[in-house]
Amino acid sequence: MIIGITYIEKFIDNPDELFELLKASIQWDERMVARKTASFGKAYNYSQMNYPFQAFLPELEQINSKINFTIGFEPNNCLINYYLDGKAKMGYHSDQTDILEEGTGIAIVSIGEARSLKFRNIIKPEDIQTYNLPAGSLIYMTQDVQAIWQHAIPKADTEKGRISLTFRKIK
């Protein structure tokens, strides 16, 4: 277990319905090769791409409220990553934290196919921790986690897709 990570396996109800709804209704940005993206809430600049303000969908507002109640902050942005299948991946990285409100981190809600989230210690790269992220789960990382660990979504042997809803409170 990593200090600064909160993991809740069954955080939301009906993750399969939400997966199908978002997959079909979101206008996906396809500028990234490895995955499709979308952003809701406060304007956000991510990986040299600008996402303008877009109002939260009601389904995202419900999750926002639950994060506020459970973790203790109300996100104002949700960056969504859609991994179409197991070939879609994300390499080791730390998220940008200087744009986050003090005392907040990043909450990730997973829907669709279960995937692994691997953490690698920046100072001791051989220290790797793995969290399984089934549909409906939440993993929350404090800013301190980002300073000590990098995380990645490795390739997986599946034809099914996964959507990660990454909630932040941007300054």
Language-model features: where?
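Non-heme Fe(II) oxygenase metal-center motifs and adjacent flexible, charged/small-residue loops
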Residues: 1-171
